[in-house]
Structure formats: C-alpha cells, structure tokens
C-alpha cells in the first residue's frame, strides 16, 4: 500500500513539475507521454482557428505529439525556406505518405523523388497545352450552364439548394471530362445519387483524423471504428476509379481500331485528356501495377480538380452574400463586359424578362457566348474576389512536410529529423504581420492597383503552394472558377437560408461541414 502511495506521489510530482515548467510556454501545453494530443483532439473540429490563436502572437508553434513533433509556420521567410531554399530537406515524407496512401496512393500529391518528378513532368506538359486549355474552356462553360439551369429552375420554384453539393457535382463532372475523357452525369437535372463523392469525402475525413489519432494503426489492424469505415469507403472509391480507367482505355482502343468512325468530339477527347496521356506513356497499360498507378493519378486529380475548386467557389459565394457591396461591384464589372462587347460588335444589348423562363435562359446563353479565355482575363475584380476568398479560406488550409535531417529555420526554430513542418495558409491569411491591420476583412480591393490585379509573393499567399511544388493547375482552376462565377453572379443574387450553420469540416480540404443552403433570385 505504501509503495503504491509513493509511486502515485512520484507520478503526481512528475506531472506537476512537467506542467510547471511550461507556465511561460507560448505554444500548446503538453502532458507526459501524449504531448499535446489531448489539446489537439479537444480542438479537432476547430483546429485551423486553434492554430490562428497560437500563430497570431508567435509566428512558429511547436506541437509535440506521441510519436513525432509538428512545427507550424506562418512567416513567409520560413515558408520560403521550407518550400524553396531547402526544398530537398522537406519532402512529403514517409509519415505523411503512410497516412494518405490508402486514398492518394503514390500520386503526385503523395510522392517524392523520381516518381513525383515523372508525374509532374507529364502533367506540366499537358497543362501547358493550348489544346487542353481550349478544350477545358468549352467544358467549363458547358457545366457552368448546366448548373445555371438547375439554379434557374430552383429560382422559379423558390426552392432551397445546397450550393456546395451542386458545385461539387459540377467540378467532378468537369474533371472527369477534361482529365479523364469520360462523362459521368452527376449534374444531370435529376441529380442522381453520387456514391463515389460520399465515399471519397468520408475517406478524406478519416485519413485527416489519422494525423492526431495515435491509435489509428491498431484500429486498422483490428478493422474497427473509423478504419473499418475507411476500408468500405475506399472500396467504393476504387470501384468508381477503376471503371473510369477501363472505360477510357476501351475508348482509346476503339479509336485506334476504327479511327475513321470517330466524330470530332471523340477525337478531341482522345487528344486532350490527361488520363489518356498517362496511359499512352505507360510501359504496360494492362498490368496491375499500371492500373494501380493510374488509379492514384486519377484520385489525385479528382482532389485537385473537384474538391479544391468547388470548395473555393462555395466560400466565394458565401463571402459575396456576406458582403453586398462586393456582389454589386462584381455585377457592375460583368455588365461592363456586356456593354463593351456590344460596342465592339456594334450591336444592341438583348432585352429579357426575368419572369419568363425561356427569355431568361436565352439571355444567359447569349452572355455565356461572350466568355472565353481572353474575356475572362479582363475581369480583374472577379479575379480579386476569388483570390481574396482563397486568402481567408484556402482550399488546402495546412500542408505538412517531412524533415529528413536536423535543421534550423531562418527564425532560429530547430527541427528534428523525422518530425514534420507544416505551413498554414489558413492562418497566414489572417495574420496582421502578413497582410496589415485589415487582415481579417474580406477586401478584394487589396489585390488591385488602378483596377488591375496585382499578384502577391507565393510565399505569403500560399493557396497554390510555392517553389518546385507550386500548383500546376492554378490557371485552369482560375479559368473554371471565373467562368462559373461570371455566369452565376451576373444573373443571380444568393441568399443564405436563415439559421443555416456555416463552419468548416476537418479534412484535407476546407469544405463546409453542413453545405451551403441558399435561395436564389434572378437579376435583371
């Protein structure tokens, strides 16, 4: 009994001294053995804002965990060092790869070294293609108009819609057509159930939880809890992905066998989609290894082309609803585009009746005809609205890197090999030391000088990463977002459904936890 009492006193004293030694510590307080895991788990649903609170006064926060240490950074000097200056010391790393492998495999977002370089080189070549850009422009307009039609029906029927759900459908259909050459029709008028999207989102949430769940490997081994659900979700994801790959391979084979029977549309798809390019350069397209690598490529492009774009558009529409002055300025810019086009072609603007379904839709089709790569490039305020959205609500709110060798960041913070360094775009966009005293305000004008958009350093505005891993699809993403926003914001006002909760969901992408329920009204 006395021995137990002595041990209890020793443990209590140890814990007390451990906590007492942290009384002046600026970062999260830790406990013996578990580090800051308790505080992180307690704040899991608001982790991005939890980091903002620490990084506001300290540009670097060190968070010890049971098996590693996370170092979070928000100072552009440190970010540039990690993403560019000493890039080779900060790969994705084995830890990150082990967490994400079940979902992203060895795709471009989850690989390092020669495998990453090979995929990036191929993707870079495709994204630089004018043919892909022109094909993408047509596809993005097509699906933006499909979304418009659904919203038009909702406006006449005075129905609520979930904009996040609709935008996720639009971007999934778009990436499947542009990236993989197939049409899947999730944005059809009847809005068919989308099992893949639900399973993909579930898997994304669970792999994100792995970063702070020290028991995930045990749960995976026992096939219980969240890891059991992950396994079921991945099966749905894989079934869909392999069906896309096999369908595309069959179409390519058919095109080779009967090239004269293909119409122009099929020829375009054969030439311009990204998946076809990866199939063509593979040594043995029908081997299991190749199918697995193609699966990884497809899912990495899905998360890049569907999730990030739809999430940004969702937050952009929300911010426009919350800032009516921004909505009106954007509307004026879109009207000005119409007027300039009419003057350039010496034609009069078509009049339409917002209460007449056909008249309204005809006007929209006419306006969409004005939108192309060049005309969208003139919409500087729209570009600023999207960029300002990304500053405050970056699609990828934090991005961890592994540490290969012991190192010291420019501000003097020491990092150990085997740890992780995470730059935090969500926090960086809210820091006054990065953006000034009005950092918390949604202010598209901060990006304009004499009405012309001005870029910021990619190490300060990190929504598209920076350095050797800078996002290859940045221009394509802006193209799709501007196409959709131009059509929607020219003809609609959005109204948040009363009492609808707006908060983010903890996953690798900053999506809304409850969607974005709105009603829409037609503009004259």
UniProtKB/Swiss-Prot annotation:
Residues the record lists as binding heme: 471
Residue intervals passing through the bilayer: 2-22
Signal peptide positions (record): none
GO molecular function: alkane 1-monooxygenase activity; heme binding; iron ion binding; long-chain fatty acid omega-hydroxylase activity
Keyword Cytoplasm found: no
Effect of disrupting the coding gene: Lack of exine in pollen grain walls.
SUPFAM superfamilies reported for this sequence: Cytochrome P450
Annotated catalysed reactions: an omega-methyl-long-chain fatty acid + reduced [NADPH--hemoprotein reductase] + O2 = an omega-hydroxy-long-chain fatty acid + oxidized [NADPH--hemoprotein reductase] + H2O + H(+)
Primary residence: membrane
Keyword flag Oxidoreductase: yes
Keywords recorded for this protein, A-Z: Heme, Iron, Membrane, Metal-binding, Monooxygenase, NADP, Oxidoreductase, Transmembrane, Transmembrane helix
Record membrane topology: Single-pass membrane protein
Record-linked InterPro entries: Cyt_P450 (IPR001128), Cyt_P450_E_grp-I (IPR002401), Cyt_P450_sf (IPR036396)
Cofactors demanded by this protein: heme
Places the protein is found: Membrane
Documented EC number(s): 1.14.14.80
CC per GO annotation: membrane
GO biological process: pollen exine formation; sporopollenin biosynthetic process
Its job: Involved in pollen wall development. Catalyzes the conversion of long-chain fatty acids to the corresponding omega-hydroxylated fatty acids. Omega-hydroxylated fatty acids, together with in-chain hydroxylated fatty acids, are key monomeric aliphatic building blocks for sporopollenin synthesis during exine formation.
Family: Belongs to the cytochrome P450 family.
PANTHER family: CYTOCHROME P450
Entry protein name: Cytochrome P450 704B1
Species for this entry: Arabidopsis thaliana
